């Protein structure tokens, strides 16, 4: 028979008495001592708790605990105002004394140890996280290997067709044809992953835009296209097809940037031109292939992606337009071949002819000059200002005339003799020398 809790000690004693009567006087003698100990322990614990609750409730003289509007029974559960006494801890100790004879104490120690054992496996997943990171890196490498054969198929189709179709689009970007030399170096992209820019352009030119959201596939495309292109002209043609269609941020030339800012219709105009002069634009990429130098093109690409970072999210129209005009001149200098000059002419003509556009440089300069000149003209032309000037002049003239009249009046008063300017009269009593000098001698 297991010893029950202290509050059930009476029932346990009754059960023990029944068992003792059944077992005999010998068993009764063995059971009575532990039962008596349990009864004494239970009564002592209950009496101590009752005494602590009713009589020995600590009073905090310095705190404001007694000022609360709670009854005395609830004040035992509340904290003291000054924080000097922790009565809940004392009550917890007393409850622990009640349950001290129970075996629950051993059980309570085991769950206290369990969280420590659980903490160790919690630490293991954090250790597994770095293990997952190396797994991601090899995951990218097999993707590159698997997608390399996929790109050649697209590459083969582009090399056969883009020598005319994609090279035709090079009219919009002849300088981008120079990018192939830099693709091997994994050149710029706004997210600081250099190969992404050129690779995104490659996917768009091939028409497979569904692969754009996967950065791993784009990395594979960049690596696959660069080794497979032994001849620079073919790669130049492929990249020419890729450059006109990109988001204008990945392209290394600023001409596509100038295209969307004046009007978005320029982008469809480029593919139309590409379809029309297929044979004429095909020699364009070959000429670009004759002049590819990786160092010079790296410099041009580094200069240009910095501008698209500011140009892509730019909300201001005036500043990005200034930037577009400067890179247009740079592109014209770098461009090689007649197709390049032809491509540079339409964007140049568009901003010139796009004077009606709201955000062009010409309009901005005119607005600034007008802002500086209009206020001056308006001040002189306003009737209110003229009336104010006239009235002020009249009032000033009247005031001056009034002052002059006052001065003249004062002068006239002096001349009329408002106060007499007479010669001073001799004093009535004057000192006269005696006629005779009389000397008196004492």
Curated annotation (Swiss-Prot):
<feature type="site" description="Cleavage of ectodomain">
    <location>
        <begin position="383"/>
        <end position="384"/>
    </location>
</feature>
<dbReference type="GO" id="GO:0016477">
    <property type="term" value="P:cell migration"/>
</dbReference>
<feature type="glycosylation site" description="O-linked (GalNAc) serine; by GALNT13">
    <location>
        <position position="170"/>
    </location>
</feature>
<keyword id="KW-0597">Phosphoprotein</keyword>
<feature type="region of interest" description="Disordered">
    <location>
        <begin position="150"/>
        <end position="173"/>
    </location>
</feature>
<keyword id="KW-0472">Membrane</keyword>
<comment type="function">
    <text>Cell surface proteoglycan that may bear heparan sulfate. May have a role in the organization of cell shape by affecting the actin cytoskeleton, possibly by transferring signals from the cell surface in a sugar-dependent mechanism.</text>
</comment>
<feature type="compositionally biased region" description="Polar residues">
    <location>
        <begin position="288"/>
        <end position="299"/>
    </location>
</feature>
<feature type="glycosylation site" description="O-linked (GalNAc) serine; by GALNT13">
    <location>
        <position position="160"/>
    </location>
</feature>
<feature type="compositionally biased region" description="Acidic residues">
    <location>
        <begin position="63"/>
        <end position="77"/>
    </location>
</feature>
<feature type="glycosylation site" description="O-linked (Xyl...) (glycosaminoglycan) serine">
    <location>
        <position position="91"/>
    </location>
</feature>
<feature type="glycosylation site" description="O-linked (Xyl...) (glycosaminoglycan) serine">
    <location>
        <position position="80"/>
    </location>
</feature>
<keyword id="KW-0357">Heparan sulfate</keyword>
<feature type="topological domain" description="Extracellular">
    <location>
        <begin position="1"/>
        <end position="387"/>
    </location>
</feature>
<dbReference type="GO" id="GO:0043202">
    <property type="term" value="C:lysosomal lumen"/>
</dbReference>
<dbReference type="GO" id="GO:0005886">
    <property type="term" value="C:plasma membrane"/>
</dbReference>
<comment type="similarity">
    <text>Belongs to the syndecan proteoglycan family.</text>
</comment>
<keyword id="KW-0654">Proteoglycan</keyword>
<dbReference type="InterPro" id="IPR003585">
    <property type="entry name" value="Neurexin-like"/>
</dbReference>
<feature type="glycosylation site" description="O-linked (GalNAc) threonine; by GALNT13">
    <location>
        <position position="110"/>
    </location>
</feature>
<dbReference type="GO" id="GO:0016020">
    <property type="term" value="C:membrane"/>
</dbReference>
<dbReference type="InterPro" id="IPR027789">
    <property type="entry name" value="Syndecan/Neurexin_dom"/>
</dbReference>
<protein>
    <recommendedName>
        <fullName>Syndecan-3</fullName>
    </recommendedName>
</protein>
<dbReference type="GO" id="GO:0005796">
    <property type="term" value="C:Golgi lumen"/>
</dbReference>
<keyword id="KW-1133">Transmembrane helix</keyword>
<dbReference type="InterPro" id="IPR001050">
    <property type="entry name" value="Syndecan"/>
</dbReference>
<feature type="glycosylation site" description="O-linked (GalNAc) threonine; by GALNT13">
    <location>
        <position position="171"/>
    </location>
</feature>
<dbReference type="GO" id="GO:0062023">
    <property type="term" value="C:collagen-containing extracellular matrix"/>
</dbReference>
<keyword id="KW-0325">Glycoprotein</keyword>
<feature type="glycosylation site" description="O-linked (GalNAc) threonine; by GALNT13">
    <location>
        <position position="109"/>
    </location>
</feature>
<keyword id="KW-1003">Cell membrane</keyword>
<feature type="glycosylation site" description="O-linked (GalNAc) threonine; by GALNT13">
    <location>
        <position position="162"/>
    </location>
</feature>
<feature type="glycosylation site" description="O-linked (Xyl...) (glycosaminoglycan) serine">
    <location>
        <position position="314"/>
    </location>
</feature>
<feature type="region of interest" description="Disordered">
    <location>
        <begin position="340"/>
        <end position="367"/>
    </location>
</feature>
<feature type="glycosylation site" description="O-linked (Xyl...) (glycosaminoglycan) serine">
    <location>
        <position position="84"/>
    </location>
</feature>
<feature type="region of interest" description="Disordered">
    <location>
        <begin position="1"/>
        <end position="24"/>
    </location>
</feature>
<keyword id="KW-0812">Transmembrane</keyword>
<feature type="modified residue" description="Phosphotyrosine">
    <location>
        <position position="431"/>
    </location>
</feature>
<dbReference type="GO" id="GO:0044393">
    <property type="term" value="C:microspike"/>
</dbReference>
<feature type="topological domain" description="Cytoplasmic">
    <location>
        <begin position="409"/>
        <end position="442"/>
    </location>
</feature>
<feature type="modified residue" description="Phosphotyrosine">
    <location>
        <position position="409"/>
    </location>
</feature>
<dbReference type="GO" id="GO:0042802">
    <property type="term" value="F:identical protein binding"/>
</dbReference>
